[in-house]
Amino acid sequence: MSKSSDRINLTNQFLIAMPNMADPTFSGTVVYLCDHSERGALGLVINRPTDIDLESLFNRIDLKLEIEPLLHIPVYFGGPVQTERGFVLHEPVEGSAYNSSMTVEGGLEMTTSKDVLEAVATGTGPKRFLLTLGHAGWGAGQLEEEISKNGWLTVAADPRIVFDTPAEERFEAALGLLGVSSSMLSGEAGHA
């Protein structure tokens, strides 16, 4: 790709780890890409729940969560970068402006400020959200190189997979967007 205008933008795409993914951190994962530019990429793993639930996380940060259906929702491992920091992927909330939000091209938002969690705790925050600890990050050209080496498949993201599909089904559901299943994948790249 010789010109920056030729560069593909993978923002609002899923990265689906191929079977040959050597890094166990990302093996079997689906990553939602929040940002992809010439400077690099930032994404959140959406299918790795941790043993931490919202109730225990909110207690750790001195927030009282009293909304019963939310108490036992898992917090996810978002990636190996900044694992002590929370990242909330959510649908936009009309009339709200959180302190540290980024609108993802395509409609979702990613917020890193505590005010979004305060809003969730009081029932005024986003109704559909996914909270991760940590994120995945790639330097300039790094993700493109991993894709060219058959490390990832890409497909346009579907918010229903992020918010409505059980975590253990997200990998197959994301592959389904491409019309394939994991049984059809090979870790070997084809060569003519």
UniProtKB/Swiss-Prot annotation:
Q: Which GO terms describe its cellular component?
A: cytosol
Which positions, given as ranges, span the membrane? none
Give any Pfam family that matches.
DUF179
Matching entries from InterPro entries are given as:
AlgH-like
Classification via PANTHER family: UNCHARACTERIZED PROTEIN YQGE, UPF0301 PROTEIN YQGE
Q: Which HAMAP family match?
A: UPF0301
What family does this chain come from, according to its entry? Belongs to the UPF0301 (AlgH) family.
Q: What is this protein called?
A: UPF0301 protein BMA1997
